[in-house]
Amino acid sequence: MDIRIIPQKLRGAVTPPASKSMAHRAVLAMALAGGTGTLSNLSDSQDIQATKRCVAALKDPRPEGELPFLDCGESGSTLRFLIPIALAVAGGGVFTGHGRLMERPQQPYFDIFDEKGIFYGQTDGVLTVRGTLTPGVYRLPGNVSSQFVTGLLYALPLLPGDSTIEITTPLESGGYVDMTLDMLEKFGISVQNKNYAVFHISGNQVYQGRDITVEGDWSQAGFWYSANFLDNQVAIQGLNADSTQGDRVVASLYWKLAKPGDADVDVSGCPDLLPPLAVMAAVRSGTTRFVNAARLRIKESDRLATTAALLNALGGHAEEGPDSLTVRGVPAFSGGTVDGANDHRIVMAAAIAATRYSAPVTILGAEAIRKSYPSFWEDYKQLGGVFDVF
């Protein structure tokens, strides 16, 4: 699906969807609690559907010795959270996915599996993992996705003895780990956090069902913050100002970028915010450097490259480095065509940027928003956005 946007200012109120990051964690915790409790305000995004589908597959009866087949869609969280969980509850699993998912690195797990004697093999986009997680010490570098930490934090309490996770280098994505620890605590799981360097997890713990309402998504709210930066008037509702979501930092980064002059923004702890922040940077006075961004190259797209391409296609000035993006501000954009790159965040960033253009903007592959924000185009239209689908 391609969309042609006629530039218009956006005005009104919007409620971002439920937090995808929190929803993944809640769905998994509730499943490990035996399905007791209730879960409300759950996003219907493709990523959450993938986690629910895999949870159901883990519960399905199967012949003795047969591993569950887990289709993770395009969801990195689903895949990385469930690899250790499947080992803990089912002796492993056969994992598959779509898009670039199975190209995304799993080496931190593979290093652990080599040490622990757990089998793994990947052929033609299918990853098979078989073995038993045992209590003990698990080591992870801190400069990789926090999804690896979360997967272990969910699985290790189920083991018959105590375990420790050692973070061997400074942890970059502490906000996402905070979200995990908060959800585990809600479901009765105790973890001792020693300054994000060591996590002590007692074994033989039992997940306890809870009634959970998933709060609004600060990551998706980032696009509406970006809209306001571009002189739109959007009231953003339904967010928890005290949230453990790391992406709530978008509120303070908004004001940092509002100040004229050159600026550096470290996105190691909030990589998903890069596209909307880059749109803000493209129209501000000064040069903005987004640093510590190497992990963005292994998202749904090479997001450093596709964010730069988005801005440059529409008359901006962006240059990618190995782990950075440099954006020089321009007064306005000229319009053009953006390849959505099958990346939901690139599509939404382009739609927001279109409100500052002097000519129509075409976005190719606009349906990618279904991955995380299925109602994005409805919300965009309700706020006064004008577009044609072709």
Residue ranges and their predicted role:
Residues 1-390:
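Short, structured segments at the rim of ligand-binding sites
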